[in-house]
Amino acid sequence: MMSNTILPRNFYERPTLVVAGELLGKMLKFSNFSGIITEVEAYIGMSDPACHAAKGYTNRTSVMFGMPGFSYVYFIYGMYYCLNIVTEAEGFPAAVLIRGLKLIEPLEANLGGPGILCKRLNITKEHNKQDLTISHEFCVYESHLKPDYVCTPRIGISKGQEKFWRFKNLRSCVDYLPIG
């Protein structure tokens, strides 16, 4: 199911909506955890009012303007971190938010919601601006899973809700696990 092939930079250096759909079923690896990506959201450029880069370049959003394949981790509601992966060409601010994960190592229930996911994996601000294309400790691996998914409006935002840029698996990831 999981290969040892880390997704290369050119995987992320494509249109964000393409990357978002293709991240579903891939394996996120962080420290001793690995799991199937089950839900993501796309945030694309300064014309997207829900994108953190909508108001331009800042210290916080600088990573979004950088090379694709880097992590963008930020703090919300005074209690949760969120993990994004930068997409598109350098200079164009875009990223995919990782919203859901089915943990395989250790085998656990689905981690739904970006804050819960980061809390369980212990992803914090110190993991911001990490190159996910070089280290087997924090990366996304290729997999042979090609899940069916649905696109819906993004959730938990006040602007840009009309965009169907949330990608979610149609079936449980348990369906993808080997039996026995």
Curated annotation (Swiss-Prot):
Entry's Gene Ontology molecular function annotations: alkylbase DNA N-glycosylase activity; DNA binding
Keywords, sorted A to Z: DNA damage, DNA repair, Hydrolase
One Pfam family recorded for the sequence: Pur_DNA_glyco
Keyword Transmembrane helix found: no
GO biological processes: base-excision repair
EC assignment: 3.2.2.-
Assigned protein family: Belongs to the DNA glycosylase MPG family.
UniProt-recorded name of the protein: Putative 3-methyladenine DNA glycosylase
Organism field: Wolbachia pipientis wMel
